[in-house]
Amino acid sequence: MKEIVTYKGKLCNKESDFIWGDYIEESVVKGLYHFWHHQNILARHEGMVYTDGDKYVDKDYKDSLDLHVPVSLHVPEIHNYLMQLQEVLNKYLERFPFAELSRFEIIEPLSLQHYPIGGGFKEWHTERANSSPGNVYRHLVFMTYLNDVPDGGTEWFHQDKYVPAKRGYTVIWPSDWTHFHRGVVSIHQKNLSLQGGFLSHSVL
């Protein structure tokens, strides 16, 4: 007989890979797409690889054009996205209530990432890969696909799981080494996504 365990009044799920997602509203996706193409507030830059004490461009590792967006930026596109993201997070926490053992929030900038045809985050990696505060205190990771890419998406190594890039789909997962992942490179079309992390309050 399985033991029934609850936390904060929520039933805890014993069998899961802790990778879960849901769709955000199409109007919010359109807003983010418009923001990427038309905003003139922030500068784009080539995607970088971060290691302890260093950052560099390596297109064999990550080939992208990135736009870092402070969560404090007061524009409707970002505000509306954060509201929708909170709804997806609430559903995630209903399924995995132990994820609430520590308090967390978005502190780092959001990252809008544009991948050209044949581009992507090509190497296996984790979101907690070095000793910088932004890495050490990452608790959960989120990503929203902003266009359909039938031969693109994300795959996780240990879970042997693939999530296709579907417009508006927002996926959340743990940040640590257990969830090594990489992008599935499309040879047919470009890809636009938004990524970020929830950081433990210990970083504050």
Label for each model-derived stretch:
Residues 82-204:
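Catalytic core of non-heme Fe(II) oxygenases with the double-stranded beta-helix
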